Amino acid sequence: MEPHGETDLVSFAFSSPTPFDPTRPIYLDAQNPSRAFNARQFRLLVRSLIAGLRALGLKPGHCVLVQLENTVIHSALFFAIVGAGGVYMGCDVGSPAHELTHLLRLAEPQLVITAPGALSTLEVCSTQGESFSGQVLLVDELSIDNIVQFAHRAAAAGAEAQTEGLVDQTAGPCIRLESLLQHGESDWLRFEDREQSKRTPAAMFLTSGTSGLPKAAISTHHTIISHHLSVHYRVPYPVVRLMALPMYHSFGDFWTNIFPIRYGEPLYVLPRFDISTFLDAVRQHHISETYMVPAMVQILSQSSLPVAESLASLRYVGISGAPIDGFSIQRFQRLLSPDAVAGNLWGMTEVGVVFQNRYRVPLQFGSVGTLLHGYELRFVDPATGEDVAGTPDSPGELYVRGPGLLLGYKWRTDDKDEQGWFRTGDMVYARDGNYYIIGRTKDLIKVRGQVPDSLNSWTSHSTNRLCDSRYSVAPAEIEGILLKDPGVKDAAVIGVMLPDGSSEVPRAYVVRAGISPESTADQLTDLVQTQLASYKALDGGVVFVDEIPRTGIGKPHRARLSQLDREREKLASILGVSVPA
């Protein structure tokens, strides 16, 4: 592991431990590689944006909300905001008005950087009692072209002499982002003090919001540097990354901003995941490393396109963001080169990446890997609050402590206990140095049933002790079985209460794959019944839908799915029909 260094984040990122060619492009648009920055151009662009942000009135501690799709300028915006002393926050460009209203109240940004298509949503927020009084900076395709051209010219001839030709016009209450480039250059906020690094916010990353509105987890300069150092290790292949995950999300941030400028490792950027453009980008740019969420893995595994041929250059695929079963990873692994690894990993916005399967480390399918440097763990019985062994026979809720933990939540104090432990909400156990995620404690389905036929798995003999004589069923385990069926494109499982209130039971929401013959509810019920213990049966039924609601990072949005389920049952009651269908 590299030495931490007691420094600010931007200085850390721009201080390469090994020399690399500063003229090699390192941030590139995957669909238009002429939109690219080398290290010299990128450094100048960051310093120019810092000068522009300060000229616009950004002060230390001010928040800037970036509401854009993935673009080649994203990392420059990130470092410029942090370098000007500000606090970065990103969100989905397609955020609906009620979510954006919540974020404006939560983050209190002084600036919003957004796309033309999102302006109408920002206007709607003002009608919902959240009028944004700060400055709006507009970014469109012309802006990106102008910024790239500026960086190319300025790196060759000097920033102050190369501002001519930039568009400098207002668009209603907005100004174009490239107008910030007319103020010369300014150095970033620097410090070499451990305590200042640990207490100075650099970014706020939104939590997944699967059970409600997202929270803003505050990451300091020290936190983000710690995240990077925990996941970085040397590999025996040339690293060329592709990013199709949201770059504003913490999982995307881990691999997006620092690696290119610190190590000279090229990053190709796609605006979003689309299977055809993704496969084209991997093939055309000889991508060796990328990161996915399980939904992307399922799409690629089920595709009729020449996936294996297109992915031949890959050497490592990191998978996280939501639960994924061992079968799905093994199926995907067969599409990759024999020299490649598809490795699961586990982390949270609040704590960073804690467990990781690394390249050429023997894989245990279904495991999220081994513990990364710097983290401490506890396993706690959620019913008693007492520590447990964290073995397959005695799993526990995971508590984490270490330098990668959040500073806190914005406007909340329920982040860590007095000893610095963060309660993750995930049930976990360890076996032979590898860690296994059972599921979210709040998502586990509490089933009262018969004694199971087999005592071979953790769920068969431990969770009745943990959950008041009821068995805890992990939705992800059932989802993994359902996804083995070639007729299933996507699936999510929730718990529903029996009419007499005696027990929760699993109910599956399934998206068909569109092949013939179609899988039936009875077939899927039988599939689960034959492969899992009897108390994990789909006694709540199977419901076929067109789409599973998911978060921006690909997690099943179980709270929204449960709400839709309640509305469905209410409608069925009014119509006098039975459910599930």
UniProtKB/Swiss-Prot annotation:
How is this protein used? Answer: Pyripyropene A and its derivatives have very unique characteristics of selectively inhibiting the acyl-coenzyme A:cholesterol acyltransferase 2 (ACAT2) isozyme. Therefore, pyripyropenes are expected to be developed as a new type of anti-atherosclerotic agent. Furthermore, pyripyropenes have been shown to exhibit anti-angiogenic activity against human umbilical vein endothelial cells. Finally, pyripyropene A also exhibits insecticidal properties.
Do the record's keywords include Ligase? yes
User: Which chemical reaction does it catalyze?
Assistant: nicotinate + ATP + CoA = nicotinyl-CoA + AMP + diphosphate
Q: Which domain of life is it from?
A: Eukaryota
Q: Which UniProt keywords apply?
A: ATP-binding, Ligase, Nucleotide-binding
Instruction: Kindly tell me the pathway this chain contributes to.
Output: Secondary metabolite biosynthesis; terpenoid biosynthesis
Q: Which Enzyme Commission number(s) are listed?
A: 6.2.1.-
Q: Name one GO biological process term.
A: terpenoid biosynthetic process
Q: Which family does it belong to?
A: Belongs to the ATP-dependent AMP-binding enzyme family.
| Function field | Nicotinic acid-CoA ligase; part of the gene cluster that mediates the biosynthesis of pyripyropene A, a specific human acyl-coenzyme A:cholesterol acyltransferase 2 inhibitor. The first step of the pathway is the synthesis of nicotinyl-CoA from nicotinic acid by the nicotinic acid-CoA ligase pyr1. Nicotinyl-CoA is then a substrate of polyketide synthase pyr2 to produce 4-hydroxy-6-(3-pyridinyl)-2H-pyran-2-one (HPPO) which is further prenylated by the polyprenyl transferase pyr6 to yield farnesyl-HPPO.
Q: What is this protein called?
A: Nicotinic acid-CoA ligase pyr1
| Species this chain originates from | Aspergillus fumigatus (strain ATCC MYA-4609 / CBS 101355 / FGSC A1100 / Af293)
Q: What is the lineage of its organism?
A: Eukaryota, Fungi, Dikarya, Ascomycota, Pezizomycotina
